[in-house]
Curated annotation (Swiss-Prot):
Source organism superkingdom: Archaea
Keywords: ATP-binding, Kinase, Magnesium, Metal-binding, Nucleotide-binding, Thiamine biosynthesis, Transferase
The gene coding this protein: thiM
Family membership: Belongs to the Thz kinase family.
Species whose genome carries this gene: Methanoregula boonei (strain DSM 21154 / JCM 14090 / 6A8)
Entry protein name: Hydroxyethylthiazole kinase
Residues the entry annotates as binding ATP: 121, 167
Recorded metabolic or biological pathway in which this protein acts: Cofactor biosynthesis; thiamine diphosphate biosynthesis; 4-methyl-5-(2-phosphoethyl)-thiazole from 5-(2-hydroxyethyl)-4-methylthiazole: step 1/1
Any single GO BP term: thiamine diphosphate biosynthetic process
Entry's EC annotation: 2.7.1.50
Length: 266
């Protein structure tokens, strides 16, 4: 892939400062807001049923994250998602813990059934379960998947018409036809809570300015992974890594993606 493509998209996000509406979890809500700002966007978190749809109408993207779900939150997600679909606003779904409990799995399937999702991003266990593969989820973390991850990701994308991201040491992205692999990132990103949620937030920023969902997801994950690499170089461990990650994301420029994004075709 030509890194100038990712660089140009990231520059647009920095210039346009898109509003991204998050209905997310209370574990990482502040992290998602701050990483959205760092990536060039403007965050808003409105999960009340009385305003979720109205707020979505102002946004460039909608991010739905089921990390701490309940029945009221799911209804707000449906209301917001329907407005997004009516106005052709992209929806990014992060099915945190899908496969771990019946509530999480059923709620994710309901969102997939009732809404047109643009991008779904999950770990190997979450995507594997939703794709019908043999996979395990322990809490909100992947506990393994049986089968070829690239094939599972591509097939799930083809069957649903959704751009699918299976996150991992190498992120796998497919629109059902093409498959892109993103190698940016650092092991410290897996040693703090919330980096998966933050990756979805950054994806919302980029999807708000780029209609090609495959390229948008690759741009977002390369940028976030690159920020993780730079934060790790300035850190002593998980405690110092987290604030360094926000600094690195805020300091990242289009020229950094042009030089250091590592995205390849499968």
């Amino acid at each position: 892939m030509d890194n100038q493509v990712f660089s140009g998209i990231f520059a647009r996000a920095r210039e346009q400062h898109p509003l991204v509406h998050h209905i997310t979890n209370y574990v990482t809500v502040n992290d998602c807001a701050n990483i959205t700002i760092g990536a060039g966007g403007a965050p808003v978190m409105a999960d009340a049923r009385e305003e979720a749809g109205e707020m979505t109408g102002f946004a460039g993207a909608l991010v739905l994250n089921i990390g701490t779900l309940n029945s009221g939150i799911i209804e707000s997600m449906i209301l917001a998602g329907k407005v997004a679909n009516e106005r052709k606003i992209p929806i990014i779904l992060d099915p945190v813990g899908a496969g771990a409990t019946r509530l999480r799995t059923d709620s994710t399937r309901r969102l997939l059934d009732e809404l047109t999702i643009s991008i779904i991003k999950g770990n190997a266990g979450e995507i594997g379960v939703l794709a019908g593969a043999e996979a395990k989820v322990r809490g909100v973390d992947s506990a393994g998947i049986s089968g070829d991850p690239v094939t599972i990701t591509r097939t799930f994308a083809r069957e649903t018409g959704i751009t699918v991201v299976m996150s991992g040491a190498t992120d796998i992205i497919s629109d059902g036809n093409k498959v892109l692999l993103v190698d940016n990132g650092h092991p410290l990103m897996g040693r703090i809570s919330g980096t998966g949620c933050m990756a979805s937030a950054v994806t919302g920023v980029i999807a708000a300015v780029e209609k090609d969902r495959l390229i948008a997801a690759a741009t977002a994950l390369a940028a976030f992974g690159l920020a993780g690499e730079r934060a790790a170089a300035a850190s002593r461990g998980p405690g110092s890594f987290k604030p360094a990650l926000f600094d690195a994301m805020a300091e990242l420029g289009p020229q950094d993606l042009a030089a250091d994004a590592r995205v390849r075709s499968a």
